[in-house]
């Protein structure tokens, strides 16, 4: 599957290019068997925006691919398969091995 993006709110700006700094707000959940959101494992809401250089391996592959498909101001849901997430290792204490992940992401700033 890789990453599947569903737009919640259309953006009107450009899409980030590989290596550009992006500022985002996000919440992540484990996907349940029925494909819906399960347990929340992380959020930037209330903690401050998340800033990263996108497309260069600083985050999971699903984010590198999904966020570069977004436009500035866009809010989207990313469904990320295990091979584009944390894979067979998972993330100890938060994400079990081979978990499909769901992220709601807002692309707030590029550069």
UniProtKB/Swiss-Prot annotation:
Residues 7-20 have a biased composition (Polar residues). Disulfide bonds: none annotated. It is an enzyme of class 5 (isomerase). GO terms for cellular component: cytoplasm. Signal peptide: none annotated. This is FK506-binding protein 1. It comes from Gibberella zeae (strain ATCC MYA-4620 / CBS 123657 / FGSC 9075 / NRRL 31084 / PH-1). It comes from the Eukaryota. Inhibited by both FK506 and rapamycin. It is found in: Cytoplasm. PPIases accelerate the folding of proteins. It catalyzes the cis-trans isomerization of proline imidic peptide bonds in oligopeptides. Keywords: Cytoplasm, Isomerase, Rotamase. Its EC number is 5.2.1.8. It catalyses: [protein]-peptidylproline (omega=180) = [protein]-peptidylproline (omega=0). GO terms for molecular function: peptidyl-prolyl cis-trans isomerase activity.
